[in-house]
């Protein structure tokens, strides 16, 4: 029965692919827009209570606050207070306690109202926010969530170590309790934005005698603390996109602990799954998804004599893969009503990395030698290869 079902789905999908690849880009995009408008019109006839609540909160916010003229941090603060930061968070934590997919309504309406796009330097908000909301106590959530969302306090991730990359639970950074504080010693590496961050998501070993998954504790580390040293990691290109962080007798208040002592593994899993969510869904990373637009631009700029059917077919295959990925992300988001993403986003991250890798290779082949003078094509292709785990 299962084999027959899979064959039927494959057959239906192949028919869809064959149909789409015979269409022009304009026809495809027009069809997509028409479907979106149809679904929107159908949805407007019967709005559920949670959707109505979000729209009412947006109406109230936009009546008294104009995002196109206000200071961005001030507007985001008002947005947090209205429960429109992360709508699936609890009331008082920047949310309304509704299902997470309603965040899309908030983002769409605020964009239409002239709100500024999210600053890429606040990317780790998408990781730290859900972790603190899920595992932090009331005082931790009250202290960190609002300034994190407004962008007044930027965050970084302090997970990987020279001897603990894929084997994250094998980390060696130690935290020893001293009254109401913890003394931290160790090194972290590959830390994006650590040089501009105010706080770091820090996972340490607090019980070396316990099994390695059990003796870990999660902290919010003040990156300005005495004993914290951030060093840039210079790449062969001359750039320094990553850092390494050294901690020598750094004192961390117990009030900055996220979750119970020894429960750092559970808290870190929330961070890691939201990282997959952010990357897999195409959010937070400035160029994520831009490869598809690049491929279209390269195609449109090509001489007509070079636009053979095989190349057009390959380009349309990329479009289908990107659209399937987008719809898969939407479905995964709808299923994650608890606000904790599942393994689907790990798969999506790999799928998007493979897709972008193929798109960059496609552009390189179309451009030939001209691709060598473009940073994005020559460097992003191997970068996506690394991101996909190869």
Identify the residue ranges that each predicted region occupies:
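Low-complexity, intrinsically disordered or signal/transmembrane-proximal segments
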Residues: 7-9
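Amphipathic, small/basic residue-rich leader segments at the start of a protein or domain
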Residues: 20-123, 133, 140-150, 304, ...
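A short, Trp-centered hydrophobic/proline-enriched beta-strand micro-motif
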Residues: 151-159, 203
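A structural signal for short hydrophobic beta-strand segments in well-ordered beta-sheet cores
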Residues: 173-176
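A short core secondary-structure module
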Residues: 185-231
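Glycine-rich beta->alpha junctions and the first turn(s) of the following alpha-helix
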Residues: 228-327
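C-terminal helix-coil-helix/basic helical segment that borders enzyme active sites and/or dimer interfaces
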Residues: 323-386
């Amino acid at each position: 029965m299962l084999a027959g079902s899979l064959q039927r789905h494959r057959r239906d999908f192949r028919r869809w692919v064959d149909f789409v690849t015979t269409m022009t880009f304009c026809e495809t995009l027009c069809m997509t827009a028409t479907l979106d408008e149809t679904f929107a019109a159908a949805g407007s006839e019967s709005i559920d209570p949670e959707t109505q609540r979000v729209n009412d909160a947006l109406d109230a916010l936009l009546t008294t606050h104009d995002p196109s003229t206000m200071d961005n941090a001030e507007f985001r603060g008002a947005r947090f207070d209205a429960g429109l930061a992360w709508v699936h968070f609890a009331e008082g934590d920047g949310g309304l306690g509704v299902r997470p997919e309603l965040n899309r309504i908030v983002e769409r309406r605020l964009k239409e109202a002239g709100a500024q796009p999210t600053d890429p330097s606040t990317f780790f908000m998408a990781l730290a926010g859900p972790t603190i909301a899920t595992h932090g106590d009331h005082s931790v959530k009250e202290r960190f969530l609002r300034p994190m969302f407004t962008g007044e306090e930027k965050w970084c991730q302090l997970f990987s170590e020279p001897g603990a990359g894929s084997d994250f639970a094998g980390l060696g950074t130690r935290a020893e309790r001293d009254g109401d504080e913890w003394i931290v010693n160790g090194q972290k590496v590959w830390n994006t934005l650590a040089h501009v961050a105010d706080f770091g998501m820090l996972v340490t070993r607090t019980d070396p005698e316990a099994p390695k998954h059990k003796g870990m504790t999660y902290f919010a580390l003040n990156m300005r603390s005495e004993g914290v040293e951030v060093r840039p990691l210079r790449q062969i290109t001359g750039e320094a996109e990553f850092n390494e962080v050294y901690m020598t007798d750094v004192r961390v208040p117990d009030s900055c602990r996220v979750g119970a002592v020894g429960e750092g593994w559970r808290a870190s899993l929330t961070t890691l799954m939201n990282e997959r969510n952010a990357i897999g869904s195409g959010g937070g990373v400035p160029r994520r998804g831009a490869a598809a637009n690049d491929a279209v631009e390269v195609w449109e700029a090509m001489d007509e004599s070079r636009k053979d059917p095989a190349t057009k077919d390959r380009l349309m295959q990329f479009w289908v893969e990107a659209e399937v990925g987008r719809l898969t992300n939407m479905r995964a988001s709808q299923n994650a009503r608890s606000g904790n993403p599942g393994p689907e986003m790990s798969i999506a991250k790999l799928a998007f990395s493979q897709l972008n890798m193929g798109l960059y290779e496609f552009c390189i082949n179309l451009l030939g030698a001209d691709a060598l003078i473009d940073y994005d094509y020559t460097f992003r292709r191997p970068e996506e290869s690394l991101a996909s785990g190869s």
